[in-house]
Amino acid sequence: EMLNVVVKGIAAGKRGYGIGPAKVVSNPEEAAQVMKKGDILVTDMTNPDYVPFMKLAGAIVTDKGGVTCHAAIVSRELGIPCVVGTEKATQVMTTGKECTVDSKSVVAYEGAMATMTAQLTSSEGAAPSQAAFVGGTFQAVPTTATKIYMNLGVPEKIEDYKDLPFEGIGLMRTEFILASYIGTHPLEYVETGRSQEFVDKLADGISTVARAIQPRPVVVRFSDFKTNEYRELKGGEKYEIVEANPMLGWRGCSRYISKWYEKAFRLECQAIVKCRKEWGLKNVWVMLPVVRTLWETKAVLEIMRQEGLERSKDFKVWFMAETPSIAILADEFSKLADGFSIGSNDMTQGILMIDRDSERLGQMGYFDERDPAVERIIAHL
């Protein structure tokens, strides 16, 4: 069976096939008008506002992005095929036309591939046996000296994973809660006198996961949106600058200690306090992203202390290890943290001076977490 290849790109998401009508959109508002369950989402590049429609998609195709872009990360979490960095999908694919997205061969075909349609149809009834298989192997998993922690972005997905043999959530991303559940820039809540509403919503999203797996820990990473992503939230344009390269800009700890964002960071801290002290979810820990310097780290920890969050026997503070500086000064940073979570995507970006969202460099093979320089710095850490 031969179908015309419409676009080629970079592999991302689940390795497999997605078949359905293409829906070419330029923004989340357009997606809200046209996306239905099983459609193929085609857009320039996704951001957190697209998540509700990504959940509907049978597959995702983007013009831009690399293996660590938003579309790649979310599609892996949702378990759907994804091809990114095609450069021209929005120009050559047409809304309403059937297409087949093959994330194994990293292409999108024009039309529905009959053999793949048959495979997808027959596999629909396999879910119960797969779940039974997972449940059946649970008891056979050996005890290991190494603890197994999971990553999680979409809180409600914990229901699919909670019975798996893992010791905790090592990275819970708050960005999905901010984009899909809250939707408004935190400083807009502050300015309009609704700070408590923001705290309650964020705490509610975090508690969904913490309650489901307690007493296993949930390491909640404080927000790590880039400026361009914050601008997409309601009211965001009032509070965010425009940066040429947001990946290397005002993000992570540098936001928390700034006069422009500190009030919002304090709300995030208050949400953690609410989970732990009001609701008794002592399994909620935290992690700081994009830790660059010792002085900023100490400043962040002081703000946390003022809000009632201090390292203790039952409250751990981890750092994302994703900047060269934290690896080089690991002995000093380790005095301030209870653990590190290696962010190999950003570490690779920093070591090789590569924009991880560059589709061109991704296509050329430059973005490689196995590069000897990256491996050596991680080994040093």
Question: Where do the language-model regions lie?
Answer:
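Conserved alpha/beta-domain cores
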Residues: 133-381
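Acidic, glycine-rich flexible loop/linker segments
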Residues: 4-40, 44-172, 185
